């Protein structure tokens, strides 16, 4: 839908890095929290009826843009990070994280009636969110964990959020990042001869940098898998951690290395 809308309206959001991605972002913003550009570089809350109709029919987003009831002029976003999930399955997902400013509007998200993916929202300082995750008080998907770490690091270096996001947007982080399902639980997908359609076995590293570590199911046999595992072991040692145990959960050939 969004690609077709972009093809049919090539001037829409042509000033952004990727017009298709920007159209998807703006449509999803309306659907999920009722936000849309205000035409002045900030965001506003759209009419609730418009939000509901777009939730029912995605085609309606372009319809309301053409009618002028949804604005896209002067829309600005900063891409601050890109995360591509490791090969858990044949289809991999890429997450692109944007920074959008709401300025002084003080708008509050509004979830669609009866069809929201969310239970609640909260404005959260990055450092407090990271600490809450470390304390097992909230759960975060792995891509968001490394994103929050990047934001906290940039915030410490640059002093305020706007400066932190400006710095991150210059060279958005992407490529290799550790995959943490929980504090002290890191996953390393290793290519193995496992049962199709799977292509990898999940090796786990337990523990935190500087502390004792345990490796579970390091099923590396191929050159590629051995290189991945070797780099991870070097990374662990550089963090001044000690590997105190290796555990194999069972004797299947795709779990033994």
Residue ranges, per PLM feature:
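Active-site metal-binding motif and surrounding structural segment of the metallo-beta-lactamase
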Residues: 225-257
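Amphipathic alpha-helical
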Residues: 156-170
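Conserved beta-strand hairpin/beta-sheet module of binuclear metal-dependent hydrolase folds
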Residues: 185-236
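NUDIX/MutT-family hydrolases
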Residues: 74-81, 94-103, 110-138
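Active-site-adjacent beta-strand/loop module that shapes the phosphate/pyrophosphate-binding cleft
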Residues: 49-108
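Short Pro/Gly-enriched beta-strand edge/turn motifs at strand-loop
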Residues: 77-81, 182-191
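Conserved Nudix-box catalytic region and its N-terminal flanking loop in Nudix hydrolases
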Residues: 1-55, 134, 138
